[in-house]
Amino acid sequence: MGAGEERVGAMRDDADRRLGRRALLAGGAAAAVGTAVLARQELSRLWWRLPGVERPRVAGAVDFRGARWVAASAANYRRADRPDDYPVDRVVIHVTQGGYASAVKVFQDPSHEVAAHYIVRRDGRVTQLVRELDVAYHAGNRSYNERSVGIEHEGFVEDASSFTDAMYAASARLTAAICARYGMPVDREHVIGHVEVPGTDHTDPGPHWDWDRYVGLARRARESREKI
Ligand SMILES: [Zn+2]
């Protein structure tokens, strides 16, 4: 999990912040049509007309087939339009240091300012909490948050038995799908632990996480995806 970075976004009203971005971009369009003043609604309509700025979102939609959707608090991520605004070139592996339910509760609590895109349970069940379009606050490093997809794993860094076969298999399929989506190689340069994020004091996923096994599984999952 990450610390409470990017406090600025949380302190400001989301609608106002988004209007600021809309106004900035729609300003050019307004000048082009010769209109001096536009009402707020008109600004936002122009914004939606601009191509490629933001994809339509469907409530409850997930980026990984079979994932269950549980929304994180909007204070725990920043809306974005990845990979158009921020290229995605990392998967960051985390361990929750607690149970699944308590981790989900933290991600739904606006006071924590942390959330990952996904959490994988001991039984291999995958839950998505933040769309990959958006910047989740999981890495404790702004640029790594912007460039990565974060996957939490239920369990404890110091407890090797946390990491079950079902968890490895499901998470590896998820990582394979993410790497395929953004054209990333499945390797230890692109699939990293939270411990490897610059400046972090977090140690997850820790010494019991079997990287050779995980990357091997993810590579095989990627290859079988390509054969389909
Ligand atoms: Zn972490």
Where are these regions (language model features)?
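N-terminal catalytic cores of peptidoglycan-degrading enzymes
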Residues: 2-140
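Basic/polar, cationic surfaces and motifs that engage anionic cell-wall
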Residues: 2-19, 26, 39-71, 157-228
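Extracytoplasmic/periplasmic, Sec-exported soluble proteins
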Residues: 85, 110, 139-143, 159-170
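Structured loop/turn residues at beta-strand edges in well-structured enzyme cores
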Residues: 86-87, 146, 186
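Residues immediately flanking
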Residues: 95, 153, 195
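Metal-dependent polysaccharide deacetylase catalytic core of the NodB/CE4 family, i.e.
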Residues: 136, 153-158
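Short coil-to-beta-strand
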Residues: 142-153
